[in-house]
Curated annotation (Swiss-Prot):
This is Cation/H(+) antiporter 11. Belongs to the monovalent cation:proton antiporter 2 (CPA2) transporter (TC 2.A.37) family. CHX (TC 2.A.37.4) subfamily. It comes from Arabidopsis thaliana (Mouse-ear cress). May operate as a cation/H(+) antiporter. The gene is CHX11. It is found in: Membrane. Gene3D superfamilies: 1.20.1530.20.
Length: 783
């Protein structure tokens, strides 16, 4: 099929689209290169073949797949372009419709979609959530490298006029300084996701600093483009373009933003956004790109600004991501990155090294200035050395996101092909080396290392208790309040400070964020579950006669990174214990219903990393229902503590001792004693010290104490099953180091290892009981 277009009165431009295959001319099979569709198909096949082959080797040494995209472009570059040059004459007599036309269109489309989706998934609000330090770093990291502008006039005598005129050479140096000074937020976000530290304190700091820097960069880009138009084109056109940009911002903020909010408001909760609105938003993003091109601005600015306006997360943000992310990230983005790298001719760096060596010097100088500036600020604000260096490297990271800028200035002839090739190779080295260096020097687990005692056992007897509770689903609210009611007391000398954290799986945004409900964000209050839960906790606080204070937060986070948000908040709130639901769900009759594997995995991560003690609550239903029933008797909640021995049991004992001030709770401590020699004398001494005040009935009237002698594992199991029928809630330690040999025979039958041996027995599916269980692990002290 041929398309013929008449242009003016003197030239015919034809463009061959589809062919009849290789058999169209068997003597010359390369005839297919004269048709755009077969050529595009061959290009895409070669691109993904080289990507797959490159990644097969690079993934063995931990290099990200993005580097494979770049290397595929370098492999295909000069060789493929030779083929394209041969095909251009066959494809079209119009030089604009050469062999790269179709591939370039896909590349631009991919770049637009990627920029739009990344800004939709990236919340700029993160810039204001980490205090003063990221703001200072963001500003300094942008302006400090501009100091290198003072070196622009060095070695101007050595500029070869055949390479570039003096004015253009100085403009090229200026472009390098500006592009290298800017830190693109999507680039920072990508490396943090790759390193899986986006939820860490370091990740939040880097994101915030990058957001500030990126805002300054966008403003500088608009000013620089307007100035270039003013100087090289026309004063009137420059003013027109600037006014057009201002009008665009006004339309976006006062027309498009309210329309987006209207779409969100009219979408029922838990219902998808209608396709017509999704398509309208996408078309608006494309229209904004065309608008900016018409007014001589970078086309990516339009989708970027449109993406910023769209609220992250459900319903609209997540709908856009679900509909377009896979196609963009798995098809269009690889083609876009590879196409940009295909334009890189590494041989030009060698042949024109004397012409670009000063550009290389400027790039490295800016890198050093940025590293030193960020490192100095981080050390000044008392960050550890390793974290300071990691932040500096992350903010100096260059990757495929910068290709948009490089290609734009190349097409406008602000930089040469040799400089472009160097910048591509520089980004390739940065994308491959920086993640491995940061990974080797920074472990996110170190964030939660705590050398101070952060448990209940070591609290002062009359000090307040700080607890962090986590909620996954609406049914977690009642069981959590029921547990907290055990500590409420009319005695105000023993206050309880509760931090409630709603855990929301991140779907439509890329940046995790923790929001305090004291700020009354509209979108959060429109979530009926969270709003209702907050009202329930507020009522609980009012009914507790000021003995309990409750602060609520919501964490939007990725499922596999939620433990980092929990640990960070636990550190910030100086909590002594984190309480999380087990993930095992029961029916109203106490029958097993389901297991939440994601919740169980989260609990295991917390057990390994928590900076304080942790409790896992298994609620069969009766405990939470009974806590709301007011009994005429003094006690209506029976809590049993099964004490075998070890630090976790001592922590569990310290916890229940704080329940004795609640007149509705009766606590019984049952100690199981094995009739053989104790393995650890020191643990035995510590156990007796913790139980000493309970053994004396005169000094302790609120907690009952009893001992049972067991001779075998079978008797332990029978004792646990009998106790499960007597109490509403059983509190047990997770590990029992002292008697590991006695309980070792049960470990191979454990279904829920995060609950330990005894906890697993009490939470077993076939246990004919309605008892709820709290499994306690004392803070894992790091050395």
């Amino acid at each position: 099929m041929n398309t013929t277009t008449y242009i003016g009165h003197c030239r015919i431009s034809f463009f061959n689209i589809s062919s009849q295959g290789f058999w169209e001319n068997l003597k010359s099979p390369d005839v297919v290169f004269g048709y755009s569709l077969p050529l595009l198909e061959i290009q895409i096949i070669l691109i993904f073949f080289c990507i797959v082959m490159s990644h097969m080797f690079l993934r063995c040494i931990g290099v990200s797949q993005i580097v494979s995209y770049m290397i595929a472009g370098l492999i295909l570059g000069p060789q493929l372009f030779d083929i394209l040059e041969k095909s251009s004459g066959k494809l079209s007599a119009d030089p604009a419709l050469d062999g790269t036309a179709a591939l370039r269109c896909i590349s631009v489309f991919g770049r637009l979609m990627f920029t739009f989706l990344m800004t939709v998934r990236t919340s700029r609000r993160v810039a204001f959530h980490s205090g003063k330090l990221p703001v200072v770093i963001g500003i300094v990291s942008f302006f400090a490298p501009l100091f290198s502008l003072s070196f622009l006039n060095l070695f101007t005598d050595n500029i070869d006029p055949h390479y570039m005129s003096l004015d253009k050479a100085l403009a090229e140096r200026t472009v390098i300084v500006i592009t290298q000074s800017q830190i693109l937020l999507p680039s920072t976000t990508y490396i943090l996701l790759e390193l899986k530290i986006i939820n860490s304190e370091l990740g939040r700091l880097a994101l915030s600093a990058s957001a500030i820097n990126d805002m300054l960069g966008i403003f500088a880009m608009i000013v620089a483009t307007t100035q270039a138009t003013y100087i090289h084109v026309s004063h009137a056109i420059a003013y027109r373009d600037l006014v057009a940009v201002i009008i665009f911002f006004l339309i976006v903020f006062f027309v498009f933003k309210p329309m987006v909010q209207w779409i969100i408001d009219r979408t029922p909760e838990d219902k998808p956004v209608e396709d017509i609105y999704i398509h309208a938003v996408i078309l608006t993003a494309f229209a904004s790109a065309a608008y900016f091109v018409f007014f001589n601005m970078k086309y990516v600015l339009g989708p970027l600004i449109i993406g910023i306006i769209i609220p992250e997360g459900p319903p609209l943000g997540s709908a856009l991501e679900a509909k377009f992310e896979r196609l963009t990230m798995n098809v269009f983005l690889p083609i876009s990155i590879t196409f940009s790298a295909m334009r890189c001719d590494g041989l030009r760096i060698l042949s024109q090294f004397t012409d670009i060596y000063f550009n290389i010097f400027l790039t490295l100088l800016i890198l050093v200035i940025k590293l030193v500036a960020c490192l100095t600020l981080c050390l000044y604000y008392k960050l550890p050395r390793s974290e300071s260096l990691a932040v500096s490297l992350i903010l100096s990271y260059k990757s495929f996101v910068e290709f948009v800028l490089y290609e734009a200035v190349l097409e406008e002839k602000f930089i040469s092909q040799a400089t472009y090739a160097f910048l591509i190779l520089y980004s390739l080295l940065s994308a491959g080396i920086v993640p491995m260096v940061v990974r080797s020097m920074y472990d996110p687990k170190r964030k939660y290392v705590n050398y101070q005692k952060r448990d209940i056992l070591h609290l002062e007897a009359n000090s307040g208790l700080r607890i962090l509770t986590c909620l996954h689903k609406p049914e977690n609210v009642s069981e959590t309040i029921a547990f907290l009611q055990l500590f409420s007391s009319p005695i105000h000398d023993f206050p309880i400070a509760v931090t409630v954290l709603h855990l929301v799986k991140l779907v439509g945004q890329i940046n995790p964020i923790i929001v305090s409900h004291d700020k009354k964000l509209k979108r959060l209050h429109k979530n009926s579950y969270i709003h209702t839960a907050n009202l329930a906790f507020r009522q609980f606080m009012q009914e507790s006669l000021e003995s309990v204070t409750v602060t609520t937060f919501t964490a939007f986070s990725h499922e596999n990174l939620m433990h980092e948000d929990i640990c960070t908040l636990a550190l910030d709130r100086t909590t002594s214990m984190i309480v999380v639901p087990s993930g095992r769900k029961w029916t109203v009759d106490g029958m097993f219903e389901s297991d939440d594997l994601a919740a169980r995995q989260l609990n295991q991560s917390l057990l390994d990393r928590a900076p304080c003690s942790i409790g896992i609550l298994v609620d069969r239903g009766q405990f939470s229902r009974k806590s709301y029933v007011t009994s005429k008797n003094r006690y209506n909640i029976d809590v049993g503590v099964l004490f075998i021995g070890g630090k976790d049991d001592r922590e569990a004992l310290s916890l229940v001792k704080r329940m004795k001030y609640n007149p509705r709770v009766r606590v019984t401590v049952i100690r199981l004693i094995f009739d053989h020699e104790i393995e650890s004398e020191w643990d035995y001494i510590l156990d007796n010290e913790g139980l000493k005040d309970l053994k004396s009935t005169e000094s302790n009237e609120d907690i009952l104490y009893t001992e049972r002698i067991v001779t075998s594992v079978v008797e332990v199991v029978k004792a646990v099953q009998l106790l499960a029928e007597e109490y509403d809630l059983m509190v047990v330690g997770r590990d029992h180091d002292m008697t590991s040999q006695d309980l070792s025979g049960l470990t191979e039958w454990v279904e829920l290892p995060e609950l330990g041996v005894i906890g697993d027995l009490l939470a077993a599916r076939d246990l004919n009981s309605k008892v709820s269980v709290l499994v306690v692990q004392q803070q894992q002290q790091q050395t």
